[in-house]
From Swiss-Prot:
Protein family according to the UniProt entry: Belongs to the endophilin family.
Annotated coiled-coil segments of the chain: 181-201
Source organism, top-level taxon: Eukaryota
Biased composition (Basic and acidic residues): 243-257
Gene: SH3GL2
Name of this protein: Endophilin-A1
Gene Ontology CC annotations of this record: cell projection; cytoplasm; early endosome; glutamatergic synapse; membrane; presynapse
Organism from which the protein derives: Gallus gallus
Length: 353
């Protein structure tokens, strides 16, 4: 910096101190200018905080955000492609559900249901990734550009104007000691800077409908996300309801213990057992129908709910007398006749065609 430049900086600093400490009054700016300056300052602070809060809204885990930022920075330094995206909570939940759904298998109700919901969560995570990209492209990036370009430019103009104001006020206090031309030039420079700053602030505030459009893009992106999320959740809800209906329509299975082991204490003779004297007790054959006539064995208990139905217990042998239709048999048990559902029994001797 030249000697003249250093001298000018010293004069500005002297004027600033005299205003702050000594109570000297500087050139006043008009109310319209100060109001525009206030609105620009609020806009600048709003843009910074809203960008930060939007990122927190989309990516709520601070540890994951920090890790992702570090990975992307390292990838950029190494000249690699952009690293992995933010790990959505829905994707993590989907992985767990799909894993245990596979482990449980198709033989139970819970396993396939876990797989259904896991797939839905996976779809939700993909829709959430789309939301992230949409909001970044149409909301965060434009705000970042507004901050880095327009607002920064305005701050530069205001700073330059303030420096020229201090220079003008310093020279104005020394009017008579300085050439009039020097004072006139200082005033012209101050007015010029004030006009540029005022014009840039006016243009920014006048075009704030652009920020409204960016807000609209944010809301539209969220609306689209929630529409797709609703469709995904409705589909999986329908699947789960179907599974519940199907399971409730199935006959209730009763636990039937297997025959217990017994010890054979007999000695002598040919022992045909090869397991150290341990044998399994045999289940007695249920009394009921003769096996040389059409009959069936009850797989479950059946409680008659309507007149004409035949009740029985699991394991009962029922004599078959007739097939009413594809869903019902007619049979006899303990001297009583009635109807019962086909899917409750296992055919031992079929009815003749």
């Amino acid at each position: 910096m030249s000697v003249a430049g250093l001298k000018k900086q010293f004069h500005k600093a002297t004027q600033k101190v005299s205003e702050k400490v000594g109570g000297a009054e500087g050139t006043k700016l008009d109310d319209d200018f100060k109001e525009m300056e206030r609105k620009v300052d609020v806009t600048s602070r709003a843009v910074m905080e809203i960008m930060a809060k939007t990122i927190e809204y989309l990516q709520p885990n601070p540890a994951s955000r920090a890790k992702l930022s570090m990975i992307n920075t390292m990838s950029k330094i190494r000249g690699q492609e952009k690293g992995p995206g933010y790990p959505q909570a829905e994707a993590l939940l989907a992985d767990a559900m799909l894993k245990f759904g596979r482990e449980l298998g198709e033989e139970c109700n819970f396993g396939p249901a876990l797989a259904d919901v896991g797939e839905a969560m996976k779809e939700l995570s993909e829709v959430k990734d789309s939301l992230d990209m949409e909001v970044k492209q149409n909301f965060i990036d434009p705000l970042q550009n507004l901050h880095d370009k327009d607002l920064r430019e305005i701050q530069h103009h205001l700073k330059k104007m303030e420096g020229r104001r201090l220079d003008f006020d310093y020279k104005k206090k020394r009017q008579g000691k300085l050439p009039d031309e020097e004072l006139r030039q200082a005033l012209e420079k101050f007015d010029e800077s004030k006009e540029i700053a005022e014009s840039s602030m006016f243009n920014l505030l006048e075009m704030d409908i652009e920020q409204v459009s960016q807000l609209s893009a944010l809301v539209q992106a969220q609306l689209e996300y929630h529409k797709q999320a609703t469709q995904i959740l409705q589909r999986v809800t329908s699947k789960l309801e179907d599974r519940i209906k199907e399971a409730s329509s199935q006959p209730k299975r009763e636990y039937q213990p297997k025959p217990r082991m017994s010890l054979d204490f007999t000695s002598g003779g040919d022992n045909t057992q090869h397991n150290g004297g341990i044998s399994h007790a045999t289940t007695p054959k249920p009394a009921g129908a003769h096996m040389d006539q059409p009959c069936c064995r009850a797989l479950y208990d059946f409680e008659p709910e309507n007149e004409g139905e035949l009740g029985f217990k699991e394991g009962d042998i029922i004599t078959l007398t007739n097939q009413i239709d594809e869903n019902w048999y007619e049979g006899m048990l303990h001297g009583q006749s009635g109807f019962f559902p086909i899917n409750y029994v296992d055919i031992l001797v079929p009815l003749p065609n």
